[in-house]
Structures are given as C-alpha cells and as structure tokens.
C-alpha cells in the first residue's frame, strides 16, 4: 500500500489549491523553511503549510492519494534542487583543504550573507525573498569565474617557471 501511495502523481490541486508544476518560483527563504520543516512536530503538515498555505485541519480531510502525490512531487523537486546546488560546489586545492577551507561553510546563512554582500544588500533577511534560481545562477557564475581565475593563475605560474629555466 505504501509503495502505491508513494507512486502517486503530482495532483493538480490539493484542498482546492493549485499545485505548481515545479518549485522554480520559490524564494530561497521558502527553501530554507522547508529544510527546517523536517524538525517540526508534524513535518508533512508544515511542508504543505509552507508551500500551499493549507492548514493541518484541511490537510486531514484531503484525499490521501493527493497528499502522497504532493509529497512525492516535493521530495523529487528538492532532490533536483539539491543536486543543482551540489553540482556547482567549488573545488579546493589540497593547500586550501589543509588550511581548513571547509570550516568556512556557514550553511544557509552563509549563502544569504554571500548574496547580500554580492548585491550590496544591507539586510540579509531581504535575500530570503529572492528566487532560489537567481541565487543559484549567481553562485554558479561566481564559482565558474573563480575556477577560471585559478586556472589562469596556474597558467601564469607555469609560464613563469618555464621562463626562469
């Protein structure tokens, strides 16, 4: 039974509220709220409240197939989003690793703070309202730029070694 419920498709509506086709329109803050929802007393109701503004009372009256379909949809979308962010993580040299660069991972607040500084926003909370796809694209661009600068620096270093010989 559980296998059948988990295989339910995304419903078009849940409790009369339209279900989006994907989660691309979410703000970064909403994604962060979803991450924190796992620690809620009722994570399922909290997830539905965050995304569709449906109360737990209304959710209890919903068709169980629709609820499971919605949850499966959200789970797959979050996997997709996490993979996108995972695919653009910066690579570090062994020297950077030895120096403790991984200790500079400040989680969600670090992303909010980085984007705020990047865009000249003085209040990090304002970044919570920015679409996650925008933050993702800026992060991807910055990481690509950083990787290019590392390669270029390495080329300059190699050229200097050749000239000194």
Place the predicted regions along the sequence by residue.
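An amphipathic, hydrophobic-aromatic interaction surface with interspersed Lys/Arg
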Residues: 1-165
